[in-house]
Amino acid sequence: MVPTMTRCRIASDADYLSKLELEEVTHQLKELTPKLAIEHVFADDGKPGVDVANAPNSPSRVAGLMKGLIDGEFDALVVNAAYLPSKLPGGLTIGAITDRLTPYEVLISNDCLLDELPEHASVAASDIRREAQLLYYRSDLKIARAKGSVDSVIQKVKNRKLDAAVLAASDVERLKKQDYVVEFLTCSICIPAAGQGSLAVLVRSDEEQVKKAIRGINHPASYSEIIAEWAFLDHLGAPEHAPVGALGSIEGKVLELEGMIASPDGTERIHSVVKGSVGHEVELGEKLAQEVLDAGGRDLLQEPDLR
């Protein structure tokens, strides 16, 4: 029998939103196991393997945090699932995927819907996936690559330095900024990043005691959806910088999965949807990826910008 853990050191990045995410996981764990003592470790505490010069949630930053976990600097790591690679480094596994918040994108503006924004409106987007899909939907938009926190981007819109911004609904919700939301963007406009809306708790694969302490907060439906999304990314084989999105949703015992790949300039967007039974997440992800590849995604991946 695996003994019950009494103390757990859990890490996250050090920005405000990451700390809120860590608190969210801590609250769930304390509700499940009130006697579990939890110590927080943050990326700016001078821990080896964490490059604090990089922006929060950047690939190198997340890689540094995962290295810290592999090296045993803490027992578990909380990461927004949208920022994880589809394949984890050797020695790590998913301890839990939390109950998913709204996975969609939202529009922040001064009371204009996306279709109502003036021609050539300036719209902030933090990554190439959002940028490419917005340009595919409205090629006239002037996309500004968003820098800084969600709060700072919202303030730029409110101060009219930007006409609008597209942000993850879950980030806005965690920051309690829902009053600024003008519109939820459907997948016909912008498919979210794989994993968006959930938090992933990573643990070392050989730490049975930690896995036992964490697994109780796993949300099975969210886990299934995200495993399918990651399988889509993995089988698609697109590079890290490619404009790729995926979203799974479960109703009863049916899992619907949709995904897309776009050209960075937004001139092309290849999209497909598949349905299947819960329990066949990897097969569904692979099937969707194959459909997207066969519909033109394979040719798109040969473009110089996506090599």
Model-derived segments and spans:
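Short, well-ordered beta-strand segments
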Residues: R9-A11, L77, G95, A124, ...
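Glycine/Thr-rich phosphate-binding loops of Rossmann-like dinucleotide-binding domains
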Residues: K87, Q133, L175
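Short beta-strand-centered segments that line the small-molecule binding cleft or hinge
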Residues: V62-V106, Q178
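A conserved helix-loop-strand patch within extracytoplasmic ligand-binding domains
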Residues: G90-L141
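Small-molecule-sensing regulatory modules
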Residues: M1-P59, D71, A81, Y136-R307
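Alpha-helical segments flanking ligand/cofactor-binding loops in enzyme cores
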Residues: K67, L114, I154-Q155
